[in-house]
Amino acid sequence: MAGVTNYQKQGAVQNTGDQLALFLKVFSGEVLTAFTRATQVMNNHMVKTIDSGKATSFPVMGRGKAHYLPAGANLDDLREAIPHNEVVINIDGLLTSDVLITDILEAMNHYDVRGEYAKQLGEALAISADGAMVAEIAKLVKANKENITGLGKGVVIEKTLTGGAGINYDTGKAVIEGLLEMKAKWTSQYVPENERFAYITPEVESALIASKDAINRDFGAVASIVDGNINKLCGFKIIAVPHLKAGGADKTGMLGTAPEGHVFPTEYAKALAVCAHRTAVATVKLKDLQLEHARRPELQADMIIAKNAVGHGGLRPEACGIILAK
């Protein structure tokens, strides 16, 4: 008997081509949704997309100066050139997260695993990206350098906590004081007052609520003890990041002869908050988040891969800061 050819191909577009095409789109959407929900930093910094190449540069300019021009004097004698510099951010390589789903185990399974796998693939890439960007903020502070003389360096504010950091009044009070000091320091370095972000752990967020001042309506705080979250404080948008100090993915496999990787500095292990303006760090995208499906007949399995090719780096040290417990 000849093989049946007129069966219904639910996953194929108009019954032709890839029989999994339509199924994959659903899975891809789930990965993208999971990535968007999990990332806490991606929308709060600069992103640049390139069509080709291994790196891109961001120009850095200093500040001009004003001079009084006496009668009969020449502007050429007073003019001071505005200093320039550049920051280069390299593509890190191809970052991947994948699953291998065998036919026999999927057939035996009594529940659907693909939805959860989609979530895990998206979250893996999101957490890696978040960790890398927060690490780059901290690395700019640790470097203690200026892009151009006079623009300013990263800010470290140390707060003494006798009993150690915890979900308590003292920790919350220390963070509020630290944010106020950071606000003053940044303003003195001409960091724009809008789009300032403070990344904290969930424990620090709870400590802020425990301090009461953060949710005190008399102080105009944008927070709620009912929901247990804080939106804005001292001019900073407050964002709780569970993986605050995790850093990026392991640097093994990154491009370059001796890549540094995106490792959160151990010196800041007691950081209460990592602060940054939107322009402090940047991501360069060569390949945005994509999903690839491959049939592995030799294994009788489906392989699903989420991937992107991006690079992360610091731009403006003067717009970075750490609030550190000691």
Task: Label the model's feature ranges.
Residues 1-87, 320-324:
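N-terminal "assembly arms/tails" that initiate or stabilize quaternary assembly
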Residues 2-8, 285-326:
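Extended, compositionally biased alpha-helical segments that mediate assembly or anchoring
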Residues 18, 22-34, 178-183, 272-274, ...:
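Short, Φ-rich (hydrophobic/aromatic) sequence segments
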Residues 58-60, 83-149, 153, 187-202, ...:
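Long, contiguous amphipathic alpha-helices that act as assembly "spine/axial" helices in icosahedral shell
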Residues 66-69, 100, 109, 207-210, ...:
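Short helix/loop capping segments that flank catalytic or ligand/cofactor-binding pockets
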Residues 146-226:
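Extended, solvent-exposed, turn-rich assembly/linker loops in the middle of proteins
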Residues 227-293:
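Glycine/small-residue-rich hydrophobic helix-like segments
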